[in-house]
């Protein structure tokens, strides 16, 4: 299905454009093994991928939340370049969309410093007209605030935009802001889980966007 009304595409970063899953899992396990020895295994931390760190750690130990976030971020920074890669067809798709005149943005719950690390490592930063991070908003996804901020910066109406992501936070943020939405089938939580939130599209690979927009 082609939708030529679209003029802007917003992307989540982690798990959507770049594969940070192993980095996130390792960062959680490193932190939780210190504060909650023996209580968390790999499968236990998968639900933590997507929500803001504060939301996750405050639910585990409110008193130690800030300490846990600091430990997580220190480990995450240390191991970042070792464990992060871009997903297949991402670079080529962004390049094609940019050449075709689409406005592109990132809407993420990460802090700007780690966002910049990922963009630099994968070389995709130059494709984006705006990047909205956790530093920029009071209410992260699934609240519509970060999506609305990105659209405001781009001068784009929600009806002309697609929000792309691997997590229900992304789909719901787009819906709450009035955009179309696209889930990604490579989400670590499984495409079926994401489909339950009824995104308008489900991408099997990022280059599917070229067909949705009519670029190819």
Swiss-Prot record:
Keywords carried by this UniProt record: Hydrolase, Magnesium
Entry-linked Gene3D superfamilies: HAD superfamily/HAD-like (3.40.50.1000), Putative phosphatase, domain 2 (1.10.150.240)
Cofactor annotation: Mg(2+)
InterPro entries noted in UniProt: HAD-like_hydrolase_sf, HAD-like_sf, HAD-SF_hydro_IA, HAD_2, HAD_sf, PGP-like_dom2, Pyrophosphatase_Ppax
Active site: 12
Enzyme Commission (EC) number: 3.6.1.1
One GO CC term, this protein: cytosol
Membrane-spanning parts: none
CDD domains according to UniProt: HAD_PPase
Reactions mediated catalytically: diphosphate + H2O = 2 phosphate + H(+)
Pfam (any one): HAD_2
Keyword Hydrolase: yes
GO molecular function: inorganic diphosphate phosphatase activity; magnesium ion binding; phosphoglycolate phosphatase activity
One biological process term in Gene Ontology: DNA repair
Enzyme superclass (EC): hydrolase
Function: Hydrolyzes pyrophosphate formed during P-Ser-HPr dephosphorylation by HPrK/P. Might play a role in controlling the intracellular pyrophosphate pool.
Stored NCBIfam families: HAD-SF-IA-v1, HAD-SF-IA-v3, PRK13288.1
Family stated for the protein in its record: Belongs to the HAD-like hydrolase superfamily. PpaX family.
Full protein name: Pyrophosphatase PpaX
């Amino acid at each position: 299905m082609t939708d030529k009304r679209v003029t802007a595409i917003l992307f989540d970063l982690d798990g959507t454009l770049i594969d940070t899953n192993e980095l996130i899992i390792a960062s959680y396990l490193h932190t939780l093994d210190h504060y909650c020895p023996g209580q968390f295994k790999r499968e236990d931390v998968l639900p933590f991928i997507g929500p803001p760190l504060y939301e996750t750690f405050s639910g585990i130990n409110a008193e130690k939340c800030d300490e846990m976030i600091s430990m997580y971020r220190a480990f995450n920074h240390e191991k970042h370049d070792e464990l992060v890669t871009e997903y297949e067809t991402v670079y080529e798709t962004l390049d094609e969309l940019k050449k075709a005149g689409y406005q592109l943005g990132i809407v993420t719950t990460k802090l700007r410093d780690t966002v910049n690390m990922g963009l630099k490592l994968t070389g995709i930063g130059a494709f984006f007209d705006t990047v909205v991070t956790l530093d920029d908003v009071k209410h992260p996804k699934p609240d519509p605030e970060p999506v609305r901020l990105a659209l405001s910066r781009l001068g784009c109406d929600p009806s002309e935009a697609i929000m792309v992501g691997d997590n229900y936070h992304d789909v719901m943020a787009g819906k709450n802001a009035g955009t179309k939405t696209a889930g990604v089938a490579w989400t670590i939580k499984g495409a079926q889980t994401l489909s339950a939130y009824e995104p308008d599209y489900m991408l099997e690979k990022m280059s599917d966007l070229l067909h949705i927009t009519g670029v190819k």
